[in-house]
Amino acid sequence: MREVVLNRFDPVIYPYKIWVAITDNFNDVSGRFLSYDGKGDIKFLDTDKCHAMTMAVMHKEDYKYGAIILFKSKKEMNIGNITHEASHAAKLLFEHIGADPAEHEPFEYLLGWIAECIWTVLKEKKQKNE
């Protein structure tokens, strides 16, 4: 397994983390996370055609819940894919805290914040290995 830089972001007001990484093999990060229910390692199957992926996870080291957002390459980090994956992550966070995305403003602010996290990784402003 190759070492992949995981960029961790903390929304502070929510008990949930966002991890963003760029790797051409999503399984490179599987050893660092458990499935959301904590019952086993995450596994990525049939990801050859995926350009990006988001899933709810639990971090193995500190048992923090969050969403991992993975991109195959910087080329795949276009505005469409960033928005798409940020939307998945925002929905997962709202599901985790029992909030309704129909309460528009909090959801939209969160979506924008997650997109900004991804943009930060794309622009290499933050590289924190977790």
Predicted regions and their residues:
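Intrinsic-disorder/low-complexity, polar/charged segments
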Residues: 22-28, 73-78, 97
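Non-catalytic terminal regions of proteins
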Residues: 1-49
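Active-site scaffold of zinc-dependent metalloenzymes
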Residues: 34-76, 89-93
